[in-house]
Design a protein with these regions (language model features):
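Terminal, low-structured helical/coil segments at or just beyond the last alpha-helical repeat
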Residues: 23, 332-373
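Alpha-helical segment of the N-proximal tetratricopeptide repeat
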Residues: 23-52, 61-68, 102, 166, ...
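Structural signature of tandem alpha-helical TPR/SEL1-like repeats
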Residues: 34-43, 47, 68-81, 102-115, ...
């Protein structure tokens, strides 16, 4: 009997030792991470969280390993569990935000990154990622607010300054955009993109002559860069410098013979010069390349009407209206076409629409001109 009891004691002791040997510890998991055995480290952290389900740090560590394995969805679940257990655990919101950001989920990244920045206002990483997430989420005013602070501490970071400048431009904060683009041009005088962005900012401020100078500089630096010559031509067209614009558009076509916008605006210039045959050739080719160019369909309608191809003209004008029903010019042209066809009721309907749209434009303009109440 004594021997039997002794055997039971020894067996119980061995079982206890075996269980202790099989119970993983955080040190085991961290050692596996350092060895690069991420799959084993993940399994170990999962066992630890099962054994100690109230251990926030264990869930946080599991999230880090999962992120290293690019298992971002699972990592986010682990981070959220860690935060639920201990909302004050440092670094978790930042890691959660990074996992969202790396998936391109910019809207979802904003909340945890804002939390990370609130917890550590001196974190350049949290502020930078928050600014970039706002930019990715098209919250441009917010993006510029965060990125402006970061750029001040990293003045030589041209790529980050470009994002800041574009954020300012898209938020219609043109003075900020101009200031940042000037810095970029000074740092990179041979950068075509810097001159283009500066030109866009100046044009946004209705300083088109200065914008043209910037686009000319871009075209000089990179004469075969796609869209640079078109951008220059568009500004020249906008300024009614049609001869210069034609040269720029032709330069774009030398790079891309099917550049739909260059074709459309060359067609517009030919139409304005009453060269309807050439205009028709350009415009028809433009709409073959792209079906969303309102100016091409509007001009096609005008040219076809001049040539008395009324059914085709009507189809083109109706397409222009469908692309943007708020613009009065296509309605006016369609009204004139109905007049030519002797359809007075339809003509009057289109002219009424023209008056309505002009009244809306006048109303908006008058409201914009009023001082704030």
């Amino acid at each position: 009997m004594i021997k039997r009891n002794l055997l039971f004691v020894i067996l119980a002791s061995l079982s206890s030792l075996s269980l202790r040997a099989q119970t993983p510890t955080p040190a085991d998991a961290m050692a596996l991470e350092q060895q690069g055995s991420l799959a084993e480290a993940e399994r170990t952290w999962r066992l630890i969280t099962q054994n100690t389900p109230d251990d926030a740090a264990a869930f946080a560590s599991l999230g880090l390993v999962l992120s290293k394995e690019t298992k971002y969805e699972e990592a986010i679940t682990a981070y959220k569990k860690a935060l639920a257990l201990n909302p004050k655990l440092p670094g978790i919101q930042l890691n959660w935000g990074i996992a969202e950001f790396k998936q391109g989920r910019f809207h979802e990244a904003i909340t945890p990154l804002a939390g990370a920045l609130a917890a550590d206002p001196d974190s350049a990483q949290a502020r930078t990622l928050l600014g970039l997430s706002c930019y990715g989420a098209k919250q441009f005013a917010e993006a510029s607010k965060y990125l402006a602070v970061v750029v001040k501490t990293q003045p030589s970071n041209t790529e980050l300054r470009k994002v800041l400048a574009q954020s300012c431009l898209l938020a219609k904060n043109y003075s900020c955009a101009e200031s940042e683009f000037r810095q970029i041009v000074q740092q990179n005088p041979d950068s075509a993109s810097a001159h283009v962005l500066m030109g866009e900012a100046l044009d946004g401020m209705s300083r088109t002559p200065e914008a043209i100078v910037e686009f000319q500089a871009a075209a000089k630096v990179a004469p075969r860069e796609p869209d640079v010559n078109f951008g220059l031509g568009y500004l020249q067209w906008k300024s009614h410098h049609y001869d210069d614009a034609k040269v720029s558009f032709q330069n774009e076509l030398a790079i891309d013979p099917n550049h739909a916008q260059a074709l459309a605006y060359l067609g517009d210039i030919a139409m304005k010069e009453n060269n309807f045959g050439q205009a028709l050739a350009y415009l028809e080719k433009a709409v073959q390349q792209r079906t969303d160019l309102r100016v091409a369909y509007l001009d096609l309608g005008v040219v076809l009407m001049e040539q008395k191809h009324y059914p085709e003209a009507m189809a083109a004008l109706q397409t222009a209206i469908k692309l943007d029903p708020t613009r009065p010019d296509a309605h006016f042209r369609l009204g004139r076409l109905y007049q030519a066809l002797g359809n007075a009721p339809e003509a009057e309907r289109e002219f009424a629409k023209v008056r309505e749209l002009h009244e809306k434009e006048d109303d908006v303009a008058s409201k914009m001109g009023k001082p704030p109440e």
